[in-house]
Amino acid sequence: MGMPSWLENIVFYEIYPQTFLDTDGDGIGNIQGIIRKLDYIKNLGCDGIWLNPCFASPFYDAGYDVADYKKVAPRYGTNEDLKELFRKAHEKGMKVLLDLVPGHTSTDHEWFRESCKAEKNEYTDRYVWTNNVWDDFKDVGSITGSIRGFSDRNGCCAVNFFSVQPALNFGFARCDKEWQQPMDAPGPMATREAMKDVMRFWMSMGCDGFRVDMAGSLV
């Protein structure tokens, strides 16, 4: 699939939701505030909005630590508010891109809680784990850190940035370590399908596409 033609010349206005217009007086910007300012953004000459992370999160990293990919953070509003933003932006001939963080989640994500369990389950291989808590990732250049000693599982989990952001398992092109899985292993394949499901979910509501955060962490 090629690049959509509308991407060739579009001008985007980037919005970090909590710093934009606050419509309910809690001191935090929200999606309704963005809706109110669509004409303002359009009049600036922008025909697209790039919305920084707006999903449910504990916000240890400005929302780039996602706890639920299919739920808008309550501080910003609801899923229906975001759906309304898509619709009203389209009425004005504007596009909306969401920030997608596919390389890692929050440690608060249900996937990670399940992956931490000693018992084998469908999320055991959703993240990058070693086979022993004493094994780390010092010889793997693509991994910058790890967390360990906090779960029932005997293993060390890779992180992509901060210690609250465990790395999702998309597999490895070359497997040099016992714990590494190839890209076509069941775990990595399930991770990719889960992320495709997230994208389908929001596009069915009217999202026009995604800006992928830390895309390099996927390869």
Segments predicted by a language model, with ranges:
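Acidic/aromatic-lined carbohydrate-recognition and catalytic surfaces
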Residues: G2-K196, S204, R211, A215-V219
